[in-house]
């Protein structure tokens, strides 16, 4: 996600996490923990736009513990 500011990037990440939480509520077979880890490892970490601590804080904000 090159070329976007950090605030916009955080908004996108938060929206994605909220969507994952919504999916977990509606689909009992959806593995929220595994998908959250996958999202971090394949998207957040390589893009290096936010730190792991910032990602974990966003997770807490949307209800992922």
Specify the residue positions occupied by each region the protein language model found.
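Short, charge-rich amphipathic interface segments used for partner binding and complex assembly
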Residues: 15, 19, 28-64
